[in-house]
Regions:
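Terminal helices and disordered tails flanking the catalytic cores of nucleotide-processing hydrolases
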Residues: 19, 59, 112-115, 172
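Signal-transmission linkers at sensory-effector interfaces
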Residues: 1-33
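Exposed alpha-helical structural elements
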Residues: 12, 120-123, 165
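Regulatory sensory and allosteric helical modules in signal-transduction proteins
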Residues: 74-137
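Helix-loop-beta substructure at the N-terminus of cytosolic sensory domains
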Residues: 26-76
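Regulatory loop-to-helix N-cap segments in sensory/regulatory domains
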Residues: 1-6, 131-138, 146-176
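Hydrophobic, Leu/Ile/Phe/Ala-enriched alpha-helical segments that form helix-helix packing faces
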Residues: 21, 37-45, 170-174
Length: 176
């Protein structure tokens, strides 16, 4: 891919993701806002991630909870932000999303502020059946940590820094 195409892809991606904050404000009352944001993040217009899970690690309550899941074969066929009721119904029927949401365990002990035990993470990856898994963690509100486990995209068109920076948007979503 030539340099101009990479720049075009980055401009398109950042334009797409830039709209997310506007949509998040418009739909702030939705309990499942994290599903909307995750869908945006992983879609063809986003980072083209085939399978991903968003979890919250809460050391204060010794709890690790699955919040939202995305799996490309179960993708919503319309525009999620323009069809919020249909999207919400769709996600309630999404087997992978429900599988992620059903995940509950004790809190992951942090080796450092950004690193969890590979053994602990591998158990989650196996449960979620994510191939060629990568993960990223970040500090969230109320002393929680966000945990994003995803299947590495085949075509890495944009910098992972963009992905990791955008993941913080999930911290603004309610956990339901």
């Amino acid at each position: 891919m030539n340099n101009r195409s990479k720049q075009d892809n980055q401009v398109d991606l950042l334009g797409h993701l830039g709209n997310s904050s506007k949509y998040m404000i418009q739909h702030h009352h939705r309990d499942n806002l994290s599903e909307f944001v995750l869908h945006d993040l992983c879609s063809e217009q986003g980072f083209k991630i085939r399978k991903a899970a968003y979890l919250i690690n809460n050391p204060d309550f010794n709890c690790l909870k699955g919040v939202a899941g995305f799996y490309h074969p179960e993708i919503f066929p319309g525009m999620v932000w323009q069809n919020p009721k249909d999207f919400t119904s769709h996600m309630l029927k999404s087997p992978f999303n429900q599988h992620v949401r059903s995940y509950t365990d004790t809190s992951l002990p942090a080796i450092s502020s950004k690193v969890f035990s590979k053994k602990e993470l591998q158990g989650i990856v196996d449960y979620l059946e994510i191939e060629d898994a990568a993960y990223h963690t970040w500090q969230s509100k109320h002393n929680n940590q966000g945990l994003f486990i995803f299947e590495r995209p085949q075509d890495v068109i944009v910098s992972q820094d963009h992905l990791y920076n955008f993941l913080h948007m999930l911290s603004f979503c309610p956990v339901f």
